[in-house]
Each structure stands twice: as structure tokens, then as C-alpha cells.
């Protein structure tokens, strides 16, 4: 899936569920933006109702536009576990993200995981981003194999300090 990229910055963030991987990615995106770097890509936050996860959204980083990716009890033909993929919504957001890639300095993905890789439009977007030579920051599901680059394993114990280590590494690599 990933073509060899010799010079591109590749940062992968992984760890168990709930340790703060998405929070760290959003922190990094915010700090890069503050340093005048344009970031494109997407993230897929979970949606909870009464403390229970009911689905996932997909959000374009550049425009902050989002829509449902997968939801419990939704009509549709593609099921992933207890969630139904809302293909039209996912496709609309992936098209927005694809249109922003060429304008970006840095690309970001949250997450490269089993669910995202089972959805054809998301899988194609992930492959497009991974094969791009621009710097990349990606959240990697704990079951996915490393893809080269630098890998940071996030834990509850290190999440507050490691985000600065990752940021410093990225900024020094971009300068």
C-alpha cells in the first residue's frame, strides 16, 4: 500500500484505545497551523450518546467540514461490526479532502485502521495520502503494521509530554 518514500517525513502515532491519539494529532495540527503550515487530511472522531459510542464521523482537516462515516442502526448495505457505513457522506468528505491535498504542506490521517481500510473511498484516500511525498502524520490503529518512518507509542503515562517531543521532531524536520 505504501510506496517507498526516501525523504518524506513520516510520523505514526499508535497506542491503545482511549489514550489520546486523536487529541495529540489535533494538538499537532493546531501547532503546525500556528507555525503557518497548511495541513490537509481527515480525522474520524467517535460519536457518543449517553456515554455510549453510536458511530463515527469523518472530518476534513482543512475545511473542518464533517459528516457521518458509520452509525448504529442506519440504513445501508456496508456493515462493519455493529455500524453501517454511510457511503455517500463518507464519499463527499473524502472528495473535499482529496481536493485539498495539493495545497497542503503537511498531510494527516486519523486513523489507518480496520474500519477505514474496509471502506473503499476511505481506503483510496488513505493510499493517495500515503503515496504522496509530502510530510505525513498519521494515527495507526494498534493492529496495523508500522509503515516506516518514526513511530510513537502513546500511553496514559506519556501522552502529556510526548506530544511536545513529536511536535519538536516535526518542526525540526520541516525547517
UniProtKB/Swiss-Prot annotation:
UniProt EC number: 3.6.1.15
InterPro entries xref list: AAA+_ATPase, Nuc-triphosphatase_THEP1, P-loop_NTPase
Claim: ATP-binding is one of the keywords in the record: yes
SUPFAM superfamilies (UniProt xref): P-loop containing nucleoside triphosphate hydrolases
Keyword set, alphabetical order: ATP-binding, Hydrolase, Nucleotide-binding
NCBIfam families the UniProt entry points to: PRK13695.1 (NF010248)
Functional description taken from the UniProt entry: Has nucleotide phosphatase activity towards ATP, GTP, CTP, TTP and UTP. May hydrolyze nucleoside diphosphates with lower efficiency.
Similarity comment text for this entry: Belongs to the THEP1 NTPase family.
Protein name: Nucleoside-triphosphatase THEP1
Taxonomic source organism: Saccharolobus solfataricus (strain ATCC 35092 / DSM 1617 / JCM 11322 / P2) (Sulfolobus solfataricus)
Amino acid at each position: 500500500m505504501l510506496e517507498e518514500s526516501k525523504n518524506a517525513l513520516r510520523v505514526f502515532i499508535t497506542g491503545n484505545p482511549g489514550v489520546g491519539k486523536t487529541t495529540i494529532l489535533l494538538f499537532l495540527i493546531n501547532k503546525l497551523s500556528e507555525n503557518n503550515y497548511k495541513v490537509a487530511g481527515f480525522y474520524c472522531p467517535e460519536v457518543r450518546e449517553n456515554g455510549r459510542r453510536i458511530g463515527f464521523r469523518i472530518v476534513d482537516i482543512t475545511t473542518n467540514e464533517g459528516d457521518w462515516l458509520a452509525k448504529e442502526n442506519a440504513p445501508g448495505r456496508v456493515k462493519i461490526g455493529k455500524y453501517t457505513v454511510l457511503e455517500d457522506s463518507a464519499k463527499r468528505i473524502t472528495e473535499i479532502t482529496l481536493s485539498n491535498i495539493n495545497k497542503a504542506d503537511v498531510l494527516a490521517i486519523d486513523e489507518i485502521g480496520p474500519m477505514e481500510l474496509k471502506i473503499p473511498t476511505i481506503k483510496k484516500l488513505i493510499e493517495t495520502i500515503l503515496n504522496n511525498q509530502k510530510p505525513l502524520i498519521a494515527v495507526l490503529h494498534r493492529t496495523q503494521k508500522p509503515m516506516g518512518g518514526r513511530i510513537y507509542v502513546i500511553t496514559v503515562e506519556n501522552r502529556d509530554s510526548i506530544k511536545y517531543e513529536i511536535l519538536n521532531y516535526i518542526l525540526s524536520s520541516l525547517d
